[in-house]
Amino acid sequence: MGITRRGKDKAAAGQAVAGGASGGRARPKKATFETSKKKDVGVSDLTLLSKVSNEAINENLQKRFEGREIYTYIGHVLVSVNPFRDLGIYTDQVLDSYKGKNRLEMPPHVFAIAESAYYNMKAYKDNQCVIISGESGAGKTEAAKRIMQYIASVSGGDSTDIQQIKDMVLATNPLLESFGNAKTLRNNNSSRFGKYLQIHFNSVGEPVGADITNYLLEKSRVVGQITNERNFHIFYQFTKGASEHYRQMFGIQKPETYIYTSRSKCLDVDGIDDLAEFQDTLNAMKVIGLSQEEQDSVFRILAAILWTGNLVFREDDEGYAAVTDQSVVEFLAYLLEVDPQQLIKAITIRILTPRSGEVIESPANVAQAMATRDALAKSLYNNLFDWIVERINQSLKARQPTSNSVGILDIYGFEIFEKNSFEQLCINYVNEKLQQIFIQLTLKAEQDEYAREQIKWTPIKYFDNKIVCDLIESVRPPGVFSALKDATKTAHADPAACDRTFMQSVNGMSNAHLIPRQGSFIIKHYAGDVAYTVDGITDKNKDQLLKGLLGMFQVSQNPFLHTLFPNQVDQDNRKQPPTAGDRIRTSANALVETLMKCQPSYIRTIKPNENKSPTEYNVPNVLHQIKYLGLQENVRIRRAGFAYRQSFEKFVDRFFLLSPATSYAGEYTWQGSYEAAVKQILKDTSIPQEEWQMGVTKAFIKSPETLFALEHMRDRYWHNMATRIQRMWRAYLAYRAESATRIQTFWRKKRTGAEYLQLRDHGHRVLQGRKERRRMSILGSRRFIGDYLGINASSGPGAHIRNAIGIGSNEKTVFSCRGEILEAKFGRSSKASPRILIVTNSKFYVVAQMLVNGQVQITAEKAIPLGAIKFIGASSSRDDWFSLGVGSPQEADPLLNCVLKTEMFTQMERVMPGGFNLKIGDSIEYAKKPGKMQVVKVLKDSPNPVDFYKSGAVHTQQGEPPNSVSRPTPKGKPVPPRPITRGKLIRPGGPNGRPARGTTNRTPQPRPGGASASAVASRPVPQAQPQAQAQVAASIPVRTQQQSQTSSASVRAPPPPPPAAPPAKAKIMAKVLYDFAGQKENEMSIKEGDLIEIVQKENNGWWLAKSGNQQAWVPAAYVEEQKQAPPPVAASRPPPPAPPAANGKNKPLPPAKRPAAGKKPASLQPRDSGMSLNGSDGSRSNTPTPSLGNSLADALLARKQAMAKKDDDDDW
């Protein structure tokens, strides 16, 4: 198997290292501690064993088997030990974990082999094959199924054809298992045939077809099995699960009725449900596409085979074979659709054609007749099996052009029994051919890699088994197969004479790997010496039906038999047909030719015990398998040069932590080439020069111990970092919890009421721009909540109303609120009375609340089915009145008033999808009396903002335009950002406790009382007006030289002058977003695009604005505040005068004179609002105190700038 290659990551390629020799390639990712790493059991790759021997391999496999690790690598070869239990390692989660992963990234697994094969096929357009070998019961079939499962899962494709191909490929497993598998002493589900499944893919890696080639079906099992073994599964499935139709048509009875299924005294198997598996077989036939007629034909042949076994013969008076039960002959003839006399003649009469050309009919004895009977059954089953495989191939034929393929070979492993015959010779011959492929591809690839990488190495000596393959298959000089054919040709009429002739040919062969013995011969295979018995071997090689049976098939009335046996019998043709040896040689060479065109992967399966126990590990038996599978040779070949080799990039990615020159705090810091980085790592880890070599693209490590040392140092690196990682992890948990809380808070604010907002927007479409709107109806904060009274609640006032009026549990309230109904008064004008309006999914309720005997009584005054409402009448004005046009002959239509009318209409449209009819006109129509329509006028003459009904008319005011839509949702009150300080990942004041980056250029103003003279002198002082400066200086007393000497040796600098007055407060300007017409005297009319000044802001949605000489209120949602320009920086003041010299040369100024009585001192400049003559401690310190607004804004700005920058990693 070739090395799994991975294409360069395009995303990572963009982050290439600039300037280094490795520029253009992705740098290694930051290293992370493998917290979920599972402790290794033994070694996962046998090439890493310190001592290579069969016993050491066996011990390592035993450790891993007992630790529930059944897979082990030998380089790229996978060794699999059958666990005889479900380890839970084939789930979808495990399968997904291997997708897109390199073999070295994950533990050994059959999915890794499948991923490697599929990836190389797709990425590099190489045909792939997976060769699975091992003895019966070692898990070959299971491994093949898992590879098919993985490829079907990862190969993609959503089209119907591709999914159908996948289903059919998976359906081949139960179908071929039922016809090709059987219970043996060593395996309850042993494959008694070999198969090579090729899955064909298109150019994008989607399966578009498949084909199957079968090898070496053990057809002798049809007619006989040893005790406690079974025939093929299908016979027991069919006899136990056949339908009544089949039982009547084909005479199917229980398996104990038939000799072929009951002779071995084993009808049932633990863990196998024949009835359930028969249904799986039938389902697989349907998936693959077998018609009912084809299925009937298949089961007819199976029934014929079963009844063939019940033909029993006895000797007649002349010693020839005679049938015991004629009824069996007649029923078998019925199944085969031939004449009963012709059938019995074909079995009991042998047709001989000597060299003279004369046709001789020779009666058969009992033994010969039984042999012919069994030959008939074996031929029927063998040809039926071949037809099923061919039929599967027809269904799986590619339906579009193919690009590449992945092949799966599941075939017998070496068989060495006490008595070995022709079957074992064929099986072991095929395994020799596969071993030859393994040697040529694996060892040759190893040698080519050393030459390509220019590595100094010792040439590997190995046994080339080509000499053994030639011994078996050669034509000149003749090999074993040719000798078998020649012996049959020489003495074809006498099997014993054929065997003797063949043995003479074997004795005449000269080959170091062939040892003739008396009645047998030994071939030295690569897996061990095998002694083959000569008795009967030539007869098995002929593998021919008698011409009488072939002639009977040609005259059968069953067309399916003609399909199974298409060849016409030429009685005059005495040319010898191809033998079984010829066919297996041709098939094996074709298989080798196919595999040589592919990139192979190998799976060696091992059976741990003979008892199918999940805990038993039979050391001698496994050791025997290790020897004949050649695992030790595989390890030695892999280790002959170097035990470990890896590309420079991957080596650096794995071990860059071990050198301080290539890493810092888990980050890759090397700026040079990857090759130089490898040398630096090996140098810093003190690996001797003789333990490694540098190739052209790879680094080679000589011994496994060196690799173990590197891995140990890498693991210890993380142990040394454990404390720091734990601390950071706990901090991260606190940080994550705080972040999650903030995200949840934001999400709740964002999502709350979203569906109500959508419903509100739908309300505009319900009105269709035909009705004027109220200003409050189109506010941005308006939501259509629906059930305002809580009628759907389980408790509270709403539940009390629901129970009082009897709303059923199957009714859901979609709208409820308080409104009014127009009640007619006798002799005077109608009057609006309060009511509760409820809309459910089926009815419209008008609920009245009355006080009866001091108790509130709630009754449903009207309960109108929604289907009875013919129309809803409303005016085009902004009023809230509407009518329900019911047209009842007994009651008048209700005329209602509801301030949430638009929402009510919207909810009613939802529950009345087919019958909702909203009539909007200049007036409102309704039946004031049954059958008598009346028109209610709507007049826009009301000085009152509230609508009212009077004298048959509704009086209202002018509303918003009918095409008005809801205003944008007003923005929430801005909240200053607050950094997450939980977990100490971000500390107050900036990351890592340092001052926030946004405040580094801001110089704090020290308090004058605590500053030294030099500090004060060095601080820039804002400039002041000369007059103010002189006035301030005149008011400050100055010490004399004597005073300075008595108090302190240092001279205190005079305090700085006060800062300049703050600039005038900037105007707040806003831009008008929408037109607004003022309805009242204190409301300002504005137009879109105007700029206005905001004088005052209120939290009720209205701002006091000023435009020119007009000052009035405007809606806050209609304007957008403009960002203000930063205030100008005040000009700096001149520095204070220098302190007087201490040497007395400069005469000090005299103290200021006190003001004369009755005179006021000169007035000072007004002080800045930020100055205070009274400090917070009660002193008369003039420390400048910045205003609260400016300091808060500055702090928020600094914090925001600190949060916006990346986290500082110096904490590491």
Swiss-Prot record:
All residue ranges annotated as the TH1 domain in the record: 773-962
The SH3 domain, residue ranges: 1065-1124
Domain Myosin motor: 41-715
Highest taxon of source: Eukaryota
Bias kind Pro residues: ranges: 1053-1062, 1125-1140
Domain called IQ: residue spans: 719-739, 740-765
First-listed, main subcellular location of the protein, grouped into a coarse class: cytoplasm
InterPro entries cross-referenced by the UniProt entry: Fungal_myosin-I_SH3, Kinesin_motor_dom_sf, Myosin_head_motor_dom-like, Myosin_TH1, MYSc_Myo1, P-loop_NTPase, SH3-like_dom_sf, SH3_domain
Region ranges (Actin-binding): 405-487
Keywords on record: Actin-binding, ATP-binding, Cytoplasm, Cytoskeleton, Hydrolase, Motor protein, Myosin, Nucleotide-binding, Repeat, SH3 domain
GO MF term set: actin filament binding; Arp2/3 complex binding; ATP binding; hydrolase activity; microfilament motor activity
SUPFAM superfamilies reported in the protein's UniProt record: P-loop containing nucleoside triphosphate hydrolases, SH3-domain
Disordered: annotated span: 1-35, 947-1064, 1115-1212
GO CC terms in record: actin cortical patch; cell cortex of cell tip; mating projection tip; medial cortex; myosin I complex; plasma membrane raft; prospore membrane
GO biological process: actin cortical patch assembly; actin cortical patch localization; actin filament organization; endocytosis; mitotic cytokinesis
SMART domains: MYSc (SM00242), SH3 (SM00326)
Biased composition (Polar residues): 954-966, 1171-1190
Subcellular location: Cytoplasm, Cytoskeleton, Actin patch
Residue positions binding ATP: 134-141
Pfam families assigned: Myosin_head, Myosin_TH1, SH3_1
UniProt family annotation: Belongs to the TRAFAC class myosin-kinesin ATPase superfamily. Myosin family.
Protein role: Type-I myosin implicated in the organization of the actin cytoskeleton. Required for proper actin cytoskeleton polarization. At the cell cortex, assembles in patch-like structures together with proteins from the actin-polymerizing machinery and promotes actin assembly. Functions as actin nucleation-promoting factor (NPF) for the Arp2/3 complex.
Name used for this protein in its record: Myosin-1
